[in-house]
């Protein structure tokens, strides 16, 4: 009886180079949710700040190098073989995983604000590398000119920014407070410009007038191009805008004062108090944006009142938290009642001007 010959083990067939890149992009994107919610790695070892930042920067350099290599080999023909591509993909995946592993070494007790900044940088690097994989997975004849280099550059920029990340929670808090000051400053300037011009949609209307000058008809009037009065402020609207602008100015003053106190009196080891200050300050800019958007016509006075009240609540909470923290020594807190009085004055005026809306 003839012995049966065992079948030879099947050799797995590698996917094409471009398919491997697409698969790697998917794998990298699956890492993003984990990074967003991932906790710091628990360890009994004392945190070594210098070693952490050195390892993080080295990991970023490795990711940047892999991005460079991949961009070069996949931006020209002939493409690498499936076996070569597999090796490239494994190196990229390993570099990204190594970077994420270093991020997880940053403990919470170093500050939530600092950890958020490092997490954001980590997400930028992972997402940038995934974008690069997706762009390079398009064949060179289909790829838009320089598109691969643009995506590669975004990864490179994210890696290059690692040394600029604040090294402690106080520096991280100052960075976030500065961003919030700038956001509120921009919103205030836009509001002031619109009020000075008395024409909030001037740019839009000018474009519309040019586009419709040759075919203006009755239908345009009905649709409001450009004569719809809903695009302009009434006298009552303009009167209400005045205390709203003052309230936004108070918001800017509040943030600038908080930033100054953190810069002058903030202590690096008081991470929890600094985090609390940043958390409440982060709510000011979105509240200012809501109020700014609500003043554009057609203006709903009740919405303006509600958004103003929300902003006032956030401002008072920010002042309360700042006053109770170590950044505000008691002799230096006299400015807080003055600012609260200014905020209350603005809100009371807004209430007066919108009272009729509540009586309808």
Curated annotation (Swiss-Prot):
Modified residues (N-acetylalanine): 2
Maturation and modification: Phosphorylated.
Signal peptide residues on this chain, from the entry's feature table: none
GO CC aspect terms: cytoplasm; nuclear body; nucleoplasm; nucleus
Pfam families: GCIP_C (PF20936), GCIP_N (PF13324)
Domain of life: Eukaryota
Tissue spec. comment: Ubiquitously expressed. Expression is down-regulated in a variety of tumor types including breast, colon, prostate and rectal tumors, and is up-regulated in certain hepatic carcinomas.
Induction remarks: Expression is induced by sodium butyrate, an inhibitor of colon cancer cell proliferation.
Protein keywords: Acetylation, Cell cycle, Cytoplasm, Nucleus, Phosphoprotein
Family annotation (Gene3D superfamilies): I/LWEQ domain (1.20.1410.10), Talin, central domain (1.20.1420.10)
InterPro entries named in the record: GCIP-like (IPR026907), GCIP-like_N (IPR049317), GCIP_C (IPR049318)
Region (Interaction with TCF3) location: 2-184, 150-360
Stretch list, region Required for interaction with CCND1: 2-208
Region (Interaction with RPLP0) location: 2-190, 240-360
Location within or outside the cell: Cytoplasm; Nucleus
Assembly notes: Interacts with CCND1 and GRAP2. May also interact with COPS5, RPLP0, SIRT6, SYF2 and TCF3.
Family according to the record: Belongs to the CCNDBP1 family.
Function: May negatively regulate cell cycle progression. May act at least in part via inhibition of the cyclin-D1/CDK4 complex, thereby preventing phosphorylation of RB1 and blocking E2F-dependent transcription.
Protein name in UniProt: Cyclin-D1-binding protein 1
The organism of origin for this protein: Homo sapiens
Gene: CCNDBP1
């Amino acid at each position: 009886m003839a012995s049966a010959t065992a079948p030879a083990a099947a050799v797995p067939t590698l996917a094409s180079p471009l398919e491997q890149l697409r698969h790697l992009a998917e794998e990298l994107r699956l890492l993003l949710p984990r990074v967003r919610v991932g906790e710091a790695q628990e360890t009994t070892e004392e945190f070594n700040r210098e070693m952490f930042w050195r390892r993080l920067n080295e990991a970023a350099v490795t990711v940047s190098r892999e991005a460079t290599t991949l961009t070069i080999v996949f931006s020209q023909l002939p493409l690498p073989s499936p076996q070569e591509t597999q090796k490239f993909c494994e190196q990229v995946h390993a570099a990204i995983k190594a970077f994420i592993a270093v991020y997880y070494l940053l403990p919470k007790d170093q500050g939530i604000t600092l950890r958020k900044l490092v997490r954001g940088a980590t997400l930028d690097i992972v997402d940038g590398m995934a974008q690069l994989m997706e762009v390079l997975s398009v064949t060179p004849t289909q790829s838009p000119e320089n598109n691969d280099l643009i995506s590669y550059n975004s990864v490179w920029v994210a890696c290059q920014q690692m040394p600029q990340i604040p090294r402690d929670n106080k520096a991280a808090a100052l960075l976030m407070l500065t961003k919030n000051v700038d956001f509120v400053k921009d919103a205030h300037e836009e509001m002031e410009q619109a009020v000075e011009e008395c024409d909030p949609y001037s740019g839009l209307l000018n474009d519309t007038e040019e586009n419709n000058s040759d075919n203006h008809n009755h239908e345009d009037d009905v649709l409001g191009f450009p004569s719809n009065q809903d695009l302009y402020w009434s006298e009552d609207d303009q009167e209400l805008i005045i205390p709203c602008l003052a309230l936004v100015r108070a918001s800017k003053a509040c943030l600038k004062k908080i930033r100054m106190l953190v810069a002058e009196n903030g202590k690096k080891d008081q991470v929890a108090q600094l985090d609390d200050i940043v958390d409440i300050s982060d709510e000011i800019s979105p509240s200012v944006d809501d109020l700014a958007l609500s003043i554009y016509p057609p203006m709903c006075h009740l919405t303006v009142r509600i958004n103003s009240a929300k902003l006032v609540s956030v401002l008072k909470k920010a002042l309360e938290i700042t006053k109770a923290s170590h950044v505000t020594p008691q002799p230096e807190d006299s400015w807080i009642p003055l600012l609260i009085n200014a905020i209350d004055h603005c809100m009371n005026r807004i209430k007066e001007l919108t009272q009729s809306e509540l009586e309808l």
